[in-house]
Amino acid sequence: MTDRLSPLDAVHRSIGAKIVPFGGWDMPLSYEEGTLAEHRACRHGAVVFDVSHLGTVRVTGPDAFDVLQRAFTNDLHRIAPGRAQYTHLLDQDDASVVDDIIIWWVDPETFDVMPNASNTDRVTGALEQIVMSMDGITIDAGDITSERAILAVQGPQARSLLSTVDEAIASVNRFDVRRLEWQGAALVVAGTGYTGEDGVEIAVPASHAAALWLALTSAGITPAGLGARDTLRLEAGLPLHGHELGAGITSLQAGLGWAVRFDKGPFRGSEALAAERDRGISRRLAGLVTEGRRPPREGSAVLRDGVVVGEVTSGNYSPELGHGIALAFLPPDASVGDQFSIDVRGTLLDAVVVKPPFVG
């Protein structure tokens, strides 16, 4: 099966992007200056990522709110139209996190549900199952991923540089969602991101994506790829599906119980998750820091007193801190300051538990 292409694929290739497969898409890993330079540009300036591989399921209709309440872990009553919310879709049987999702509540009866790259069909299927289980309920849930590009502008200078392109886009506050217009194109802009920095994500029609990209980069915003996005999200302590979330991993194990609201009523997987809450988790996600430039790596064993007690889910060298950082599943009694060892290809790295984020 051929990987899908971003509406900006030709633009990326024309400026020297290194293209890699990711979640069924061909996407830029980095550009000519490389991942390290792009990472630093985001921490100290502003970058733009093409994140068009994020799915968009547009859910509309008078029953849309009720269906999403039954589908996802968080409580939409806590926000309102014009706001965004982080949430999870769980497996019905074991409460594993099928996907972690941002919902943009665009209008009173319009929601853009934003799954990860490869999970759009699973999310759509789950919504269909929930509609079938609810009497007299109808919604319209359409995959509009291919109709638009999504550009994430992130960094401490993101808003100041964005304001030279469009002041309205630059003014969308954190976790706000607004419909805007740019050069005749209808946009949806949200104050969301995945870097630990301030910024916005812009959904733009595919027909106008290249023009908006050019306007942003001409304003001094640096193109950045998936490599920098991963090191940035790790420094920020943010989970990545397939690493810190996925099959066999629950919201509670991942330390994301704040995105779960048991008091709102039943949701998909709520019984299984409540049972885990009541009996106690068997492991928990924690941050680890190491000395030196050698980074911990995904899959590395974590040892305490010579005994394997956990596993690294994501690890890398932190450009900002100058040493290794990792997220790992550890015993539930692990506390900040506890000492462990990480086995990296036969070499043991001393590691200390910290509370993420590592930076910021």
Task: Name each model-derived stretch.
Residues 80-97, 170-183:
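Conserved alpha/beta core surface patches that mediate binding of polyanionic ligands
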Residues 50, 100, 201:
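Acidic active-site catalytic centers that drive phospho-/nucleotidyl reactions
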Residues 70, 78-80, 89-96, 101-107, ...:
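Short, charge-rich binding segments
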Residues 65-69, 86, 100, 110, ...:
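Generic internal hydrophobic packing segments that stabilize the cores of diverse globular domains
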Residues 1-89, 96, 227:
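Acidic, proline/glycine-enriched N-terminal capping motif
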Residues 1-23, 27-31, 106-360:
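Conserved, structured C-terminal
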Residues 38, 94-95, 242, 260:
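Alpha-helix boundary/capping detector
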